[in-house]
């Protein structure tokens, strides 16, 4: 299935992700527009990406905005009805996009569709016993939450909900961790539908989104962000 530039935009938030971003972009058709939001002022990174890939627009933030704000910045530049949010350490399979777009035409009421991660250690939705049966049936099934490393957003639909207008999809008070749980919970609270699409599969490397040079620096702040985000999320 050929996907037009008028149908889908891909949004990828990065932070010093030079080591993995190439494999992600190479797995995407060059007919699809990609918006990369780099959470730094790395002009060399921007110039290299835009020169190497004709379908990539790289936006530099003035500072590290975090995942939620970075995604909002990218989504604010989306002009298509659908946006596929990806982590830079995700690799699409041959039919990932065609399968999920095909299901989007069948489930018109959806807010979010998520591909199925082939990484069984870190699947991209909350596993329940009955979900395993649904996976084997290969039919889309409804869930309450999916992880944010790969999800198709019905941008036009979500942007019409009062709580999400003006592309404030993610709570920008959450810098890292649980921003996607919060996003999904707010959608479900508005009676919106979230599905996993088992026929649409991805490979997720997990934990490789930041270059090794900066991994220790990032690791030091992970626990702090996790504790703060959990506290904030539980208080909402």
What are these model-derived regions, one by one?
Residues 185, 189-236:
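Active-site-adjacent helix/loop segment of glycosyltransferases
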Residues 126-150, 156-157:
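Short, flexible, basic/aromatic active-site loop/helix in glycosyltransferases
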Residues 27, 38-46, 63:
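A conserved acidic beta->alpha catalytic loop
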Residues 83:
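Short aromatic/hydrophobic "clamp" motif used to bind/position activated sugar donors
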Residues 61-78:
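Glycine-rich, basic loop-to-helix element that forms the pyrophosphate-binding segment
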Residues 12-30:
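Short, well-formed alpha-helical segments that are part of the catalytic scaffolds
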Residues 150-162, 167-201:
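A short, conserved alpha-helix in the catalytic core of glycosyltransferases
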Residues 94-125:
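Conserved donor NDP-sugar-binding/catalytic core segment of glycosyltransferases
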């Amino acid at each position: 299935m050929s996907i037009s530039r008028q149908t889908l935009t891909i949004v990828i938030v990065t932070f010093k992700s030079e080591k993995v971003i190439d494999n992600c972009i190479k797995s995407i058709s060059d007919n699809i527009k990609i918006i990369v939001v780099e959470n730094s002022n790395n002009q060399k990174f921007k110039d290299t990406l835009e020169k190497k890939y004709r379908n990539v627009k790289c936006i530099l933030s003035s500072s590290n905005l975090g995942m939620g704000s970075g995604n909002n910045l990218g989504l604010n530049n989306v002009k298509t009805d659908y946006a596929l949010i990806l982590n830079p350490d995700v690799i699409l399979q041959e039919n990932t996009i065609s399968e999920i777009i095909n299901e989007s035409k069948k489930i018109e009421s959806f807010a979010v569709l998520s591909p199925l991660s082939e990484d069984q250690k870190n699947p991209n939705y909350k596993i329940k016993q009955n979900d395993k049966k649904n996976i084997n049936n290969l039919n889309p099934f409804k869930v309450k939450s999916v992880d944010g490393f790969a999800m198709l957003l019905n941008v036009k639909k979500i942007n019409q909900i009062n709580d999400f207008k003006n592309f404030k999809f993610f709570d920008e008070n959450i810098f890292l961790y649980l921003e996607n749980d919060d996003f999904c919970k707010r959608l479900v609270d508005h009676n919106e539908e979230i599905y996993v699409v088992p026929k649409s599969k991805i490979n997720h490397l997990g934990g490789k989104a930041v270059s090794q040079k900066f991994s220790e620096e990032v690791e030091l702040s992970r626990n702090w962000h996790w504790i703060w985000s959990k506290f904030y999320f539980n208080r909402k």
